[in-house]
C-alpha cells in the first residue's frame, strides 16, 4: 500500500500526469521493489485526504482496467 502521510515521497507520482502508465512508472521509480501485474495487482492508496489529487486519477484507473484500486483515509468528508 501507499500511505501518503507516512510516505510523502509518493506525492510526486502525478508529476507526469494522470495516465495510469505514468503513475505506475513513477511509483516504480520511487520504490523499485513494487511490481505491477495487470489483472493481479491491487493498489491501495491510504490517507487519501493528505493527497486529494490522487482522487482525480481514479477515473483513469477505472477506464484502464488493468489494476484494482482501493482508497482509504480519515476525515474524507464522504
How would you label these PLM feature ranges?
Residues 1-78:
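Phosphate-binding site recognition
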Amino acid at each position: 500500500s501507499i500511505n501518503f502521510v507516512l510516505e510523502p515521497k509518493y506525492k510526486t507520482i502525478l508529476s507526469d500526469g494522470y495516465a495510469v502508465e505514468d503513475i505506475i512508472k513513477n511509483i516504480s521509480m520511487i520504490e523499485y521493489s513494487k511490481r505491477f501485474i495487470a489483472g493481479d495487482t491491487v493498489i491501495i492508496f491510504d490517507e487519501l485526504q493528505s493527497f486529494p489529487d490522487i482522487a482525480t486519477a481514479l477515473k483513469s484507473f477505472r477506464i484502464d482496467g488493468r489494476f484494482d484500486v482501493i482508497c482509504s483515509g480519515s476525515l474524507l468528508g464522504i
